[in-house]
A protein has these predicted regions:
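Beta-strand/loop substructures that line and gate deep hydrophobic ligand-binding cavities in soluble
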Residues: 92, 96-145
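Short beta-edge strand/loop motif at the mouth of beta-sheet-based domains
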Residues: 16, 36-75, 167-168
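A short, structured loop/turn motif at beta-sheet edges
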Residues: 25-26, 56-57, 81-88, 112-122
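Hydrophobic/aromatic beta-strand elements that line small-molecule binding cavities or substrate pockets
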Residues: 19, 51-54, 76-82, 107-115
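A conserved amphipathic terminal alpha-helix motif
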Residues: 129-168
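Hydrophobic ligand-binding cavity/cleft-lining segments
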Residues: 1-48
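Intrinsic-disorder/low-complexity, polar/charged segments enriched in Ser/Thr/Lys/Arg/Asp/Glu/Gln
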Residues: 12-18, 25, 61, 75, ...
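Hydrophobic pocket/interface hotspot
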Residues: 28, 38, 62, 80, ...
């Protein structure tokens, strides 16, 4: 089970959660940066991610589709702003590939990975919002519970990479 850790927002209008993931940082990184792995965990069940298109470099695509149990479909288009291998990712939906602005955007997200003191990976996920209303909307959508569930799924996906047959 992904163990909750206490983390505090580092900027105004930010929501953040932290977990210790019982898997090596490299495996957690792969789950964030490889489309087929991201699809396994990125949305809390019973929702799923049937499509993911990732070009993990500044300005590259971060496009996903979320599918709900009743046929709902949410397309999410964004870009990566920063990619520091096995350490940090920053992405936003304020732009699409090539830094083309799109609408008002919802958030800029970041992921920080580091080695946990007693093994595993320290995982921090933050979402920074343009407005107080946007942040409150994200809270009401279930930010903490949803990302807590996704962190459990992330841990499961990362652990699946530990099988010698699946390592590259």
């Amino acid at each position: 089970m992904a163990t909750p850790i206490d983390v505090k927002p580092s900027a105004p209008l930010e929501l953040v959660i932290g977990r210790i993931i019982d898997a090596p940082r490299r495996a957690v990184w792969r789950c964030w940066t490889e489309a087929e792995l991201l699809k396994q965990w990125y949305c809390p069940k019973p929702w799923s991610v049937p499509e993911a298109d990732l070009d993990v470099r500044p300005g590259g695509r971060f496009n996903t589709v979320f599918a709900g149990p009743d046929g709902e479909r949410m397309e999410n288009k964004g870009i990566w702003l920063e990619s520091v291998p096995e350490t940090r990712l920053v992405f936003t939906d304020f732009f699409t590939e090539g830094f083309v602005p799109q609408g008002e955007g919802f958030m800029t997200g970041y992921v920080e990975l580091s080695d946990a003191t007693r093994g595993g990976t320290r995982f921090v996920w933050g979402a920074r919002h343009r407005t107080e209303a946007g942040m409150r909307q994200h809270e009401e959508m279930g930010f903490e519970a949803g990302w807590g569930a996704a962190a459990e799924q992330l841990e499961e996906a990362a652990k699946s990479l530990l099988s010698p047959a699946l390592q590259d």
